[in-house]
């Protein structure tokens, strides 16, 4: 009886504490400048969840240039917990909780990237889509929410979001105590040559030969395959005016090796025997979908392509060996994989890449880099350095979609946990 009473009292106390935290948090949010918030369904294992709209200047150095509202999501665990900023690289139409947030049992602010989704100015002036402005958005959010969360702060992101976390740390090294970069590349040029070396050496020669043979099959049998691609595109309601259908198809064939390794597809699944055009297209679209080169997706990733063409750097396609098989793509120079909005012209400036590639190995402390050995983007991973207090994990056999803490060995996970506990001065219990 006493035990039941004690349990009842504890449950009641926790319930009342949760209600009190929600009420206090509502009050504190009302007091924040330039933040509009709406309560949404509470995320599991959190006390409260909100969708936010945060007023941001288009130009952080000149408020007269106008403003926009940046979409974000707040998941509240407790005022005494660390806070994780999850930096997205693209749009974020719905909430998600990062692995890192769950791992340390923290609060989370999930932030949609400027010029994506609903985080758009009334008119898109791409002159203000720079990493300095992007990280200025993050700094402003950090400054505002530090009025509520006064414990340790972390930032994390996946892929382009991971790279954004690193650029944020470069521009504002004191905003967070720890950064965790998942599979985020830091390129070194407009066309990073390391991608080609990776694709020429990853896996086994037999597998790479199968990939190449399949590409050649697709191109040699274009007459039979293109009608199937057209039928597939009509069914999927895809439009091709930025690229015509044949050009989009050739791009998708060139993209195939990159996509194959990026997401760790199985060499045994590459169709080679008794191959029919229908079988080829069915498999091909499951790995390198032509929709990626359709008008809708080219437009949807327009801001990403602009960033890649001006500051981030990116990759291209080595086409010389396919001379005679490509009609739409050049085989005299490598076609680049950036497709700028409205086919606008933009100049690449290598200055920032040079700066961050110098800064990371010398001053990139308290950063954890997590990559998968199969992932094509591991080719442009931040190189390990003994000159900084940082950690690198290249998880064997993992790719862009599953190189995560949960995929680590017990030894790797213990190493990561020890570093986080040391840097954050907390105890992490994930038994």
Task: Enumerate the predicted regions with their spans.
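Conserved alpha/beta-hydrolase
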Residues: 102-121
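Short glycine-enriched nucleophile-adjacent loop
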Residues: 162-174, 179, 186
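Catalytic-loop region of hydrolases
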Residues: 20-107, 411, 418, 422-431
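Alpha/beta-hydrolase fold active-site neighborhood
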Residues: 233-348
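Alpha/beta-hydrolase active-site loop
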Residues: 128-147
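A catalytic-pocket lid/entrance helix-loop region that shapes and gates access to the active site
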Residues: 176-236
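Alpha/beta-hydrolase fold nucleophile elbow
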Residues: 149-159
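Bacterial Sec-dependent N-terminal signal peptides
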Residues: 1-27, 199-210
